[in-house]
């Protein structure tokens, strides 16, 4: 599955290039995190460069910057890029070019010098240039949350971006598509391929049309046919293993039918909320759900429409927490502490620095998804101990 998703990412990128060429755009902007690793593997670099070369052959300029995931990408460790591809350095810089129609365009941006940037780099962006027809900002970061423990990615204020009076802001970092402002288009297109269950739904880019005296035209474009999908439901009472089997099979078949109807492929998670006060049902979930799910994975392994990837069951209700022992209460407090990504990362420092992790596992694992999975499983264990008293 990992290899299939890697190929899906390349296919999605190539479709993006196809659309740019077919639409005869003036330029393509790639706002960081082109790679999942600090430097990018040679295979990843080759795929990127091949697409940029196609743009070059079509007479389309491309502008790229590196973000917090690929901050170590440097010229001497990277395959050569086409002449029409311009890379932003590690300080805020403005690059200019002229379109085929003769429009003068300025683009301001920067690449990350390190993984975390707590400084607001938007303060170094100049006001809109008066001598150009269009001024575009490229920025890899996120809105300031006013919390030093969370503001690690060049935190900015939306109001400040608006004050700079640019014609368009191409943002990177947030993997979900969202538009922060309409009057001045400030847009996260999201990533081009979901890689875990925090990145569900359609993925792609945006096609932006700017014309003086007119409102910008923003069009979302979908470029991937592999999507992550979460089937969420409240679990009914379970009276036997066959009930669990029927529940899983019915959910799976419904998703297969939908995938075929839409011409898509799903990576599927079954997510159920289980009533903790129903001790009989809870016992079946605890004792049989995982093994049964594994058997269904094997049964459906050759099914190409929907890959049955994951099962999560979450115990709902916490009415017995007041009956917890001091030890169990301390466990829950510790669990709350590790909701902070920085605290969670500190525990994993030795693992994350290990060469085998960085080489084989880091490209395939989302740390935020891993954190969520660990915390949910731990919470379930604590609640199970309470409900089984």
Walk through the language-model features, giving the residues of each.
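Binuclear metal-dependent phosphoesterase catalytic core
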Residues: 93-100, 189-250
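Surface-exposed alpha-helical segments enriched in charged/polar residues
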Residues: 18-21, 53, 159-162, 253, ...
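Short amphipathic alpha-helices and their capping/turn segments at secondary-structure boundaries
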Residues: 12-22, 96-98, 123-128, 256-259
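Short loop/turn motifs at secondary-structure junctions
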Residues: 24, 106, 133, 165, ...
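N-terminal active-site segment of His-dependent metallophosphoesterases
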Residues: 1-45, 369
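A short, flexible beta-alpha/helix-coil linker loop
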Residues: 33-37, 142-144, 275-277
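His/Asp/Glu-rich metal-coordinating catalytic cores
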Residues: 27, 38-209
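Accessory, non-catalytic peripheral segments of nucleic-acid enzymes
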Residues: 224-389
């Amino acid at each position: 599955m990992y290899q299939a998703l890697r190929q899906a990412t390349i296919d999605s990128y190539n479709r993006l290039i196809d659309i740019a060429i077919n639409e005869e755009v003036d330029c393509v902007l790639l706002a960081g995190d082109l790679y999942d690793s600090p430097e990018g593997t040679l295979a990843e670099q080759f795929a990127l460069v091949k697409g940029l070369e196609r743009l070059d052959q079509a007479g389309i300029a491309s502008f790229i910057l590196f973000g917090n995931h690929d901050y170590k990408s440097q010229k001497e460790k990277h395959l050569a890029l086409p002449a029409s591809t311009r890379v932003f350095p590690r300080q805020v810089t403005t690059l200019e070019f002229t379109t085929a129609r003769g429009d003068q365009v300025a683009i301001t941006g920067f690449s990350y010098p390190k993984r975390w940037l707590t400084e607001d780099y938007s303060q170094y962006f100049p006001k809109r240039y008066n001598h150009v027809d269009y001024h575009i900002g490229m920025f890899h970061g996120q809105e300031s949350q006013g919390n030093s423990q969370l503001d690690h990615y060049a935190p900015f204020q939306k109001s400040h971006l608006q004050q700079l009076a640019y014609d368009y802001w191409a943002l990177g970092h947030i993997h979900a598509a969202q538009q922060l402002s309409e009057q001045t288009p400030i847009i996260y297109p999201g990533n081009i391929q979901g890689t875990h269950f925090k990145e569900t739904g359609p993925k792609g880019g945006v096609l932006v049309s700017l014309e003086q005296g007119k409102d910008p035209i923003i069009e979302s474009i979908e470029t991937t046919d592999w999507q992550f999908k979460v089937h969420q439901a409240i679990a009914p009472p379970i009276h036997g293993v066959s009930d669990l089997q029927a529940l899983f099979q019915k959910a799976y078949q419904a998703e297969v039918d939908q995938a075929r109807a839409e011409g898509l492929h799903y990576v599927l998670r079954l997510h159920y909320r289980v009533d903790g006060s129903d001790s009989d049902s809870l016992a079946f979930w605890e004792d049989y759900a995982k093994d049964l799910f594994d058997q269904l994975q094997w049964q459906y392994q050759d099914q190409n429409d929907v890959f049955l990837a994951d099962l999560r069951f979450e115990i709902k209700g916490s009415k017995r927490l007041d009956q917890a022992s001091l030890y169990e209460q301390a466990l829950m407090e510790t669990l709350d502490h590790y909701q902070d990504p920085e605290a969670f990362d500190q525990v994993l420092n030795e693992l994350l620095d290990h060469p085998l992790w960085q080489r084989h596992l880091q490209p395939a694992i989302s740390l935020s998804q891993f954190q969520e999975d660990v915390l949910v499983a731990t919470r379930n264990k604590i609640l199970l101990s309470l409900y089984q008293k």
